[in-house]
Regions:
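C-terminal and inter-domain tail/linker signature
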Residues: 1-150
Length: 150
């Protein structure tokens, strides 16, 4: 990536730290963190117009991504949390995965292609944990990186 003019890394709000801890756990393949930190009625939104409402389905979505890139390097790029009157605590994290497509998962048969993924996760927290998660990354750009190296 080309280094841009903004070099901030966010703030130190507890909700941003909570979301970064959750994402780091997921990327370390500690999927049990979802049942520990998410509301059991979580609403999860992922690319491809995918909406699910449970721990198991949320785990499935994250496993599909991580399984395709099992040894890719995960990096927290920007972490921010916020609390305001009359609103739920919330957080946003920009993250990246960089490495080889060397596992079976959401991107089919391993190709060995070098892939860079930039992702964003926004979350809202409630009394029982993370209750809404919105994660965005571009599957088309990932497929393109895979196919251009075949």
């Amino acid at each position: 990536d080309v280094k841009g003019p903004y070099t901030g890394s966010g703030n130190d709000n507890e909700w941003g730290q909570m979301l970064s801890e959750i994402l780091t756990g997921i990327m370390q393949k500690n999927y049990s963190i979802i049942q520990k930190k998410y509301d059991r009625a979580v609403q999860t939104e992922h690319p491809g117009n995918t909406t699910v409402h449970s721990w198991a389905d949320t785990e499935f979505l994250w496993m599909g991504l991580r399984s395709s890139f099992p040894n890719a390097t995960f990096k927290l790029e920007h972490v921010i949390g916020r609390e305001d009157p009359m609103l739920s605590p919330r957080a946003a994290v920009r993250w990246s995965l960089s490495g080889k497509h060397e596992g079976w998962g959401m991107f089919d048969e391993p190709s060995g292609a070098e892939v860079y993924i930039m992702g964003f996760t926004h979350a809202e927290f409630g009394p029982y944990g993370l209750r809404k998660e919105f994660t965005l990354f571009d599957p088309v750009s990932i497929w393109k990186q895979i196919y251009m190296q075949k």
